[in-house]
Curated annotation (Swiss-Prot):
InterPro entries: MobA-like_NTP_Trfase, Molybde_CF_guanTrfase, Nucleotide-diphossugar_trans. This is Molybdenum cofactor guanylyltransferase. It comes from Shewanella halifaxensis (strain HAW-EB4). One of its GO terms (cellular component) is cytoplasm. GO terms for molecular function: GTP binding; metal ion binding; molybdenum cofactor guanylyltransferase activity. Transfers a GMP moiety from GTP to Mo-molybdopterin (Mo-MPT) cofactor (Moco or molybdenum cofactor) to form Mo-molybdopterin guanine dinucleotide (Mo-MGD) cofactor. The gene is mobA. It is found in: Cytoplasm. CDD domains: MobA. Mg(2+) binds at D99. The lineage of its organism: Bacteria, Pseudomonadati, Pseudomonadota, Gammaproteobacteria, Alteromonadales.
């Protein structure tokens, strides 16, 4: 039986380096950034959740359940993950950021294969050079551990998952898969990369 996988798209941050603009709604190639992520991930999962702490009505227009952090202090990606784990009954939860428009179309299959082959609790993606902490496949049963970590004042995702049996799913064959947008300059570069991808 195929494992049931839901996804959460993290769009709950402050986006300070983008001038405070809501990153998921910033347009890239004439479409909101999050729309690119949805297009890539929707065929790979059962349900999609969108974690947003502002502009919730706008995000709801994409047709998926919008969830906001249970703690409203903008505590980072971990807070969004904890909220998502409370809103899924799937066997696994895929976590992705809203600003990765070139995600692999085989992301779930490869991460799940790696995780199950090694009987791990979670899988973290890598571009072949470094791990991508906000691209993760994990068991929602890890929620209590993550909440305790956050409640202790910790924020760094990689510190948390290092405490668990995790595996790294490598995507060195797709080196641009996890390129994301933190500044207007990166947005322009990524727009050019997407345009080039369409031309091949």
């Amino acid at each position: 039986m195929t494992a049931q996988v839901d996804a959460v798209i993290l769009a709950g941050g402050m986006a300070r380096r983008m001038g405070g603009n809501d990153k998921g709604l910033v347009e890239l190639e004439n479409r909101p950034m999050i729309e690119h992520a949805i297009e890539r991930i929707q065929p790979q999962v059962k349900e999609i959740l969108i974690n947003a702490n502002r502009n919730q009505n706008r995000y709801s227009e994409f047709g998926f359940k919008v969830i906001s952090d249970q703690d409203t202090g903008y505590l980072g990606p971990l807070a969004g993950m904890i909220t998502a784990m409370s809103n899924t009954d799937a066997e696994y939860l895929l976590v992705i950021p809203c600003d990765c428009p070139l995600l692999p179309t085989d992301l779930v299959a490869r991460m799940l294969a790696k995780l199950t082959a090694e009987d791990a609790e979670l899988a973290v993606a890598s571009d072949g050079k470094r791990e991508q902490p906000v691209v993760m496949l994990l068991k929602p049963s890890l929620r209590a551990s993550m909440k305790a970590f956050l409640d202790a004042g910790e924020r760094k995702i990689d510190f948390w998952y290092a405490k668990h049996h995790y595996v790294v799913a490598e995507f060195s064959d797709q080196p641009n898969a996890f390129v994301n947008v933190n500044t207007p300059e990166q947005k322009q570069q990524l727009g050019e990369a997407i345009a080039n991808e369409k031309n091949y």
